[in-house]
């Protein structure tokens, strides 16, 4: 009797099959989404991707797409990340963070020309976004528009005066345009802002060398190596500078130390061989060249020899130099 009156006066109706399915799908979606979040936090990226993908098959959810993009990026699946980001931009074309995330993925895929349109869209929405100016400058640099890049980086710096990366990039571009004197103040500012950044000292060394300030360049290369003894470029620049100054014994001793530290550093053997050759030690030069090619058969030294010699034993020792 009680059940009769309950059903008689109740305003609730039994759920339709469609409503039951929607409720079930929502529950599955929530479980998959948050299982994916937990897996992602635990470093189980493959499982997280599976969870997010299955969740999105049930429901197109913007937040879940964001998680999936992050997981794809960690898994080095940039193409898959870009597909998701493209859909996110379709859903919310004015979402700034999504646009900037897509820019990062486009850089990963070497699609630098496509970056500019996204940056311009962000700047239409928010012209004070220093990161968008910086990224657009970076894209213009790699797409053969150095003047446009400098202009964009200058705007980024005006908006964020402590933007170390922008100073460094502008200095790199100016140096590439043979404007070393103009590049120097930018790299000096970068060092002031981040005194422990090895790449700044390396760049300043290259600028000093371009200006003919060889002692200052040498000091900067040494500072770079003090910050990171394994910086290959700094090691090669230091050795090359010693060779250029005809300080051959010092160059050989320096490369001895480099090779002791990194026995597999093929280019160090080649450069030590060059110094030995200039000193008249053809035998030592040949042995260094041989070791360099053994370590890196696809390197510059091997390419120079291609088609000239088929056997090291028949090769004129030191001839490559």
Question: Language model features by range: what are they?
Answer:
Residues 2-21, 286-321:
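Terminal, low-structured helical/coil segments at or just beyond the last alpha-helical repeat
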Residues 29, 62-64, 96-97, 130-131, ...:
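Helix-start (N-cap) detector for alpha-helical repeat units in TPR-like alpha-solenoids
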Residues 70, 104, 206-210, 222, ...:
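Alpha-helical adaptor scaffolds
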Residues 40, 73, 100, 107, ...:
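Position-specific recognition of the canonical hydrophobic site in helix A of tetratricopeptide repeat
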Residues 26, 59-60, 93, 127, ...:
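Short coil turns that delineate tetratricopeptide repeat
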Residues 43-50, 75-87, 109-121, 142-155, ...:
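Structural signature of tandem alpha-helical TPR/SEL1-like repeats
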Residues 24-63, 67-74, 101-110, 138, ...:
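Alpha-helical segment of the N-proximal tetratricopeptide repeat
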Residues 34, 67-68, 101, 135, ...:
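Canonical tetratricopeptide repeat
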């Amino acid at each position: 009797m009680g059940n009769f009156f309950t059903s008689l006066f109740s305003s609730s109706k039994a759920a339709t099959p469609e409503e039951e399915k929607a409720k079930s799908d929502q529950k599955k979606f929530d479980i998959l989404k948050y299982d994916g979040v937990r897996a992602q936090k635990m470093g189980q990226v493959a499982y997280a991707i599976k969870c997010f993908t299955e969740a999105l098959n049930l429901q197109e959810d913007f937040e879940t797409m964001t998680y999936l993009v992050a997981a794809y990026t960690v898994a080095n699946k940039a193409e898959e990340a870009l597909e998701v980001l493209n859909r996110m931009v379709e859903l919310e074309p004015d979402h700034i963070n999504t646009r900037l995330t897509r820019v990062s993925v486009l850089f990963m895929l070497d699609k630098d020309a496509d970056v500019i349109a996204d940056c311009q869209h962000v700047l239409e929405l928010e012209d004070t976004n220093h990161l968008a100016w910086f990224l657009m400058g970076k894209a213009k640099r790699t797409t053969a528009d150095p003047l446009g890049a400098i202009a964009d980086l200058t705007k980024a710096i005006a908006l964020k005066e402590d933007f170390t990366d922008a100073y460094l990039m502008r200095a790199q571009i100016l140096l590439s345009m043979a404007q070393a004197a103009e590049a120097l103040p930018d790299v000096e500012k970068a060092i002031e802002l981040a005194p422990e950044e090895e790449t700044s000292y390396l760049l300043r060394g290259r600028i000093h060398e371009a200006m003919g300030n060889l002692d200052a360049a040498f000091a900067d290369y040494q500072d770079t190596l003090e910050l990171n003894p394994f910086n290959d470029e700094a090691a090669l620049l230091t050795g090359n500078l010693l060779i250029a100054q005809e300080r051959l014994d010092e160059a050989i001793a320096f490369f001895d130390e480099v090779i002791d530290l990194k026995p597999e550093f093929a280019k160090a053997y080649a450069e030590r061989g060059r110094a030995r050759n200039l000193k008249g030690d053809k035998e030592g030069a040949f042995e260094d060249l041989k070791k360099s090619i053994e370590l890196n058969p696809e390197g510059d030294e091997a390419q120079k020899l291609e088609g000239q010699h088929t056997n090291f034993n028949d090769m004129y020792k030191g001839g490559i130099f």
